[in-house]
Amino acid sequence: GCDKTEGFIKITHAASINDTFWIKSEHENVSWERISFYRNPFDETISKMAFEGMGLYGIKMSETSPELSTDGSFRKCWMREDNGQIFLYKRGSDGARNAGLEPYCEVMASEVAQRILGQDAIPYQLVRLHGELASKCPLFTNETYGYVPISRFPINHSSPESLMRFYAELGSETLFRKMIVLDSLTFNVDRHAGNHGVLVENDTQKPIRMAPVFYLNLSMLPYIEISDWEHIGTKMRDYGPRIGEDFTRIGQQAMTSEIRAILIGMKSFQFSFRG
């Protein structure tokens, strides 16, 4: 099974949907063509169970189940559509009385992101899958370009200055600044070191540029209740960014004349999403 490292590697070959690395034993008769997530249909049973949050103990695992190597605490699954394009479906939380709003928040924050970052923002849409509400977005990696999260690089992941220097060396300073401003405007509390990073050439691991901006489901204050708005200024003291210490201050520090002009052009902005 996959409950131990040896079993996980034997079944998955340590393949992920982020890159093209994989491993096999010296005498194992298996090829990339057989285990590649980019070339093979996904296991629909495992996909459905991962999305529904059901345990996989006792289930016969499949080599082509990208859910087994996908990070994140929210229930999610990958699906390939008829045209071959791969999408991630991500559910909201449940349990609390104000739970489950994360897909709505991700879609709304995505609209803001599209205005600020354009094609450098991954688009999200609201859908239902297996009877449950979810956000849906396209995969942005392929067999040529992979994704490496910033957590893999030896820098201070919470320091705006360190991150700015890092991305500037890749020619992506403006994109990083726009991401920070977006997170400030949408109160994104989850821009941790796994939720932004670098596109690399899979064959050489050469860094190309900052990856497009994604993962917005904890933007837009999904857990704020109606009563909180009566003292929202005080309530906001409970919230802060992962990069920097204060949403307003870090947004101001990241601002440029170019970004300011974009925001001024959004003065009449309205969400097209209506639920």
Pin down the residues of each PLM region.
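Conserved protein-kinase catalytic-loop segment immediately C-terminal to the catalytic Asp
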Residues: H192, G197-V200
